[in-house]
């Protein structure tokens, strides 16, 4: 491929990628953090260029031994998502190579794919936690990263497909320049992190259904979550995989991934 053609191809690819992000169904993913964070709490400008060289993989690797809460389909069937590793791509600084597993009931499927950061927003007013616990802990800034994900299940498994959509995560950076998973407001009833909003599509393209997940709360989950202080599944959906969760909240003894 000539240098001119290669440059043209790269330009088209970047334009297409940006267009896909812009046209993704107009979802304000920040709204899923309300009332923890509101859009008005964030600086208008994106700080992507400023933080591009930082490694944000910690926000996805923080819960390596745990699973996210999630659902798939209109009847809120429980799906478990476990990120085993997220590694920053040295050549594409916005991209992270991801490996993990998904499970519906006891059917476990490995997946791999990418997280791509598109925007980085900074909080205009810092949050310090209960009784300002973190106020003097050397925190330089707090923010939200927003991006896209594409995760491909192993094709060797029956009824496999791929997940795609928008992602977001709360983070903070220390005075020493370290990126951290933001759990400062963990004691808040509205706390959540790592919100994923999107779809699952079968490889044969016969099915495309809604599938969302997150840490501690699930974004855009309708009447599934009826909990006040923490996530609690609606009794209406217990038969869709949530009965074991309601009996053993943290799923330590019955972790299907072990």
Q: Over which residues does each language-model region extend?
A:
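Bacterial N-terminal signal peptides that target proteins for export
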Residues: 1-9
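Short, linear, compositionally biased motifs with a strong N-terminal bias
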Residues: 13-14
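N-terminal signal peptide c-region/cleavage motif recognized by signal peptidases
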Residues: 17-18
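Central antiparallel beta-sheet cores of small beta-barrel/beta-sandwich binding domains
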Residues: 27-222, 226-258
